[in-house]
């Protein structure tokens, strides 16, 4: 199999959350990409998509959190505009467990792709709420409650018409 075929196999295992099989396939992909770069004497080596997925799998399959973070960070350094890389990094931090860093990673991913479904789902599962209407006041302040209910009722009315 080629490096690309191992990469696709690894990605398929990641989608199934079969971390051990994904890690094995992605390690083989990484190895073959490195061999390919050496043979071609080129500077391009392992694609950042592989690095990011490898980092996630290292954390999930073998609890190698620090190494997982490093791989995810390398992917982000190579290609900082990919929300998926921040999603993977956030999952690694959740495994750590470091909820604060996980949230920062997820929010950075949402800045790049506000409609990233997996990040949104993860934040929802974590119980993250939207900011209060008047963010300079506490969430339970009566003005925040009043305006929140007012906006929510107006939204429901406009959706029903």
Q: What positions do the PLM features span?
A:
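Generic detector of contiguous secondary-structure segments
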Residues: 2-38, 104-116
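Alpha-helical adaptor scaffolds
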Residues: 19-20, 27-85
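Intrinsically disordered, low-complexity, charge-biased linker/tail regions
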Residues: 1, 7, 15-20, 66-70, ...
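A short, hydrophobic/aromatic-rich structural module that often spans a beta strand
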Residues: 69-107
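TPR/TPR-like (Sel1-like) alpha-helical repeat modules
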Residues: 27-31, 94-135, 141-148
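Residue-level recognition of tetratricopeptide repeat
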Residues: 11, 56-57, 91, 125
